[in-house]
Amino acid sequence: MKNPKMTVIGGGTGISIILKSLRNEAVDITAVVTVADDGGSSGELRNAMQLAPPGDLRNVLLAMSDMPKFYERVFQYRFNESDGALAGHPLGNLIIAGISEMQGSTYNAIQILTKFFHITGKIYPSSEQALTLHAVFKDGHEVAGESSIAKYPGMIDHVYVTNTYNDQKPQASRKVVEAILESDMIVLGPGSLFTSILPNLVIPEIKEALRQTKAEVVYICNIMTQYGETEQFSDADHVAVLNQHLGRDLIDTVLVNVAKVPQAYMNSNKFDEYLVQVDHDFAGLCRAAKRVISSYFLRLENGGAFHDGNLVVEELMNLVRIVKQ
């Protein structure tokens, strides 16, 4: 029997937790990564070189690689504030940017680095061009730019993307559409709902591919609410927003953590974008999705509350075996 095909969609921080564990399973992995980041080092390089931002892709490359820890530290090394124009840039971002310039696109750079790091899965930016994320708030106000959205004091109604450097309609990478249509399972998240997951899904070709695919669509719900994005959200609210943007109820299965996060891990100065634990609305989830898997997926580490990648992947593998029957 062929290995199941699984496509994981999101941002570099959230889905890396899942990919680190998933890479050890007998599964054909494709990671689809957002290109809407406009903050920090990624934003600076994107603006200076008009390329797709490298930061999220860098994190996914490392998550899917089994390179020695020292090489990983080298790739993640961030230059000091005293280092002039290099200040704040991770070395890996500069490497991706350099190869992108040599090879004509970030897409090409990632394919080269995937081979260089002997990664067996596939990694694709959701679009081959940098995209700008726009958020329309319920009061009618609109904010452009991922890094600016959370700063506006309002509730987001919906988001959309535009090409950053031309007026053409945003287009998905062709390989991304193929992966979605050929997958047995699509995994969304975990990660920032409006600024990491949805920037991929609102690209027209990706939205349409998700409508057409026969794959099981799984959403890994966030454990904590996020400042400026999902304040006071329940888990069912997260799913409702996804279905709203996809234009129909496409989420088949939701994975939800039900382990309690200790109070000491909330409103942490170290992770100040996260607020409180997401409320569990089981009845709402059952209305929004076909299947709900509630379990203890929590991992407490370095003062933060995260998903336990091994436990999540165990459930994903059990589920994909069922849907392939």
Swiss-Prot record:
Keywords: Cytoplasm. This is Putative gluconeogenesis factor. The lineage of its organism: Bacteria, Bacillati, Bacillota, Bacilli, Lactobacillales. GO terms for cellular component: cytoplasm. GO terms for molecular function: LPPG:FO 2-phospho-L-lactate transferase activity. SUPFAM superfamilies: CofD-like. Coiled coil: none annotated. Belongs to the gluconeogenesis factor family. It holds the Pfam family CofD. InterPro entries: CofD (IPR002882), CofD-like_dom_sf (IPR038136), Gluconeogen_factor (IPR010119). Its main location: cytoplasm. It is found in: Cytoplasm. PANTHER family: GLUCONEOGENESIS FACTOR-RELATED, UNCHARACTERIZED PROTEIN YVCK-RELATED. Required for morphogenesis under gluconeogenic growth conditions. It comes from Streptococcus pyogenes serotype M1. One of its GO terms (biological process) is regulation of cell shape.
